[in-house]
Amino acid sequence: MHLLFTVLVTFFASMGAGLGTGFAGMSAAAVISPMLITFLHMDPYMAVGIALSSDVLASAVSAYTYHKNKNLDIKNGLIMMASVLTFTVVGSWVASKVPSATMGGFSVFMTFLLGIKFILRPVMTTKEAMQGVSAQKRAVQLVVCGVLIGFICGFIGAGGGMMMLLILTSVLGYELKTAVGTSVFIMTFTALTGAVSHFMIGGTPDWLVWGLCVVFTLLWARIAAVFANKAAPKTLNRATGVVLVVLGVVIMGFNLLT
């Protein structure tokens, strides 16, 4: 009975996480962690470690799918990733020096609002319009935004994927598919860094839960990424919006339960 319960919890947690990753480049940690903590009474630090390692393969497979469909900006993604990773470390160092405030709720609420934005005001930028920005200007924008995202993520410990998507589409004028593709590409490496450091500090995870989460998240992320790359922009905006709104509401519900 306990095994069946574990399988069900990990399946639904990973389904939400995989769909969020494949459609919107959202971090699996936002969905998987609260469910593992609430239902399986797992240590929060370990739950985040498991969620981040589920994120690594799911993001990598999504990034590969977006890349195959020419919806990934690798060169600029690498520039942004360097500044995000550097300042995540700075942010978490600063956070360790100030009294801890739980800011996780902020990133969940942002997920919900971002979902509503995609439904009401779809991102209809084209790839042609994206190419209109000079390479130097784009590089500077990416470094500045990367510093901001990295610092906030390190400080709060959450919200990376959503902030990247918001900034890539709203500030940097990326077309939606390319924004998600670039976001999951960066998330692959940020999640890997996070997962390794969690397990080095917190010890080995519950291997059954870890394995189930990794496999299920990978499966759902692949399904979502394939659909997202075939969908028309308007349909994709709506689908992404609905996934984000539902996940935002569900996670807020779990946060109230705990």
Task: Indicate where each model-derived feature is located.
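Membrane-interface alpha-helices at helix entry/exit sites of multi-pass transporters
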Residues: 42-50, 75-76, 173-184
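Juxtamembrane transmembrane-helix boundary motif
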Residues: 1-19, 31-39, 44, 65-151, ...
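Transmembrane helix-bundle signature of multi-pass membrane transporters/permeases
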Residues: 18, 48-56, 180-191, 244
